[in-house]
C-alpha cells in the first residue's frame, strides 16, 4: 500500500514514517510478509533466498541464520502491527484494520511453532487466546 510505480526513481515510497536503523531483515520482512497481502510461503522464501544471494556479495551470511532472523523479525513486526491495528480500532474508530489481524497473527503462529526457542511465546499466545477474540 505504501509503494507505487512512478516515471522515475522506482518504486515511489509513500510512507516512511517508521524509517529507522534496525535489523538487517526488517525491510525484507515488511515486503514479503506484509500485513495486507498473503504471499505463498514457497514464493516468500524464494524471494528471501534471492535477497540473501545478493546480500552475500557484500556480507557473508549463513542461510539458516538469516532465515531465523527474518522469521524472528517478522514476529516482532507482526506483534507490533496487531497492537497498532487494535489502537486504530479503539482510539481512532478505524475498525477496517481489524480485518488484517487474522493474517498477521497467522504469520506469528507459524513462526512460534517453527522454532523451539519460541515455545514460551507460543504458550503465552495460547493463554491469551487471541484467536478467540478474532
Indicate residue ranges for each PLM-predicted region:
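Histidine/acidic-rich helix-loop-helix segments that form or flank divalent-metal centers
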Residues: 60-68
